[in-house]
Amino acid sequence: MSSGGLLLLLGLLTLWEVLTPVSSKDRPKFCELLPDTGSCEDFTGAFHYSTRDRECIEFIYGGCGGNANNFKTLEECESTCAA
């Protein structure tokens, strides 16, 4: 295979890796935790990954405490946990 062909193959494999969604086996374990509002009362919207619904869902977060299945943006939740 020529060097141009190898570069093209490497580029395609890299693109595939970037665009392939997170699979359940690659998903961090904390994505399986239930949403936890935490112990404070500075309520704001946050997102958690729902294993039941298989998507990121908004919930009310108290501003402190809670667990790792807590994201400020939908995009952050999806890129970390969503399949």
Swiss-Prot record:
Disulfide links within the chain: C31-C81, C40-C64, C56-C77
Alphabetized UniProt keyword annotations: Disulfide bond, Protease inhibitor, Secreted, Serine protease inhibitor, Signal
Lineage of the organism: Eukaryota, Metazoa, Chordata, Craniata, Vertebrata
Similarity section: Belongs to the venom Kunitz-type family.
Domain BPTI/Kunitz inhibitor, first and last residues per copy: 31-81
Subcellular location: Secreted
Residues in the signal sequence: 1-24
GO cellular component: extracellular space
Function of the protein: Serine protease inhibitor.
One GO MF term: serine-type endopeptidase inhibitor activity
Domain of life: Eukaryota
Tissues where the protein occurs: Expressed by the venom gland.
InterPro entries: Kunitz_BPTI, Kunitz_BPTI_sf, Prtase_inh_Kunz-CS, TFPI/VKTCI-like
Pfam families: Kunitz_BPTI
Protein's recorded name: Kunitz-type serine protease inhibitor textilinin-7
Cross-referenced Gene3D superfamilies: Pancreatic trypsin inhibitor Kunitz domain (4.10.410.10)
Species this chain originates from: Pseudonaja textilis textilis (Eastern brown snake)
SUPFAM superfamilies named in the record: BPTI-like
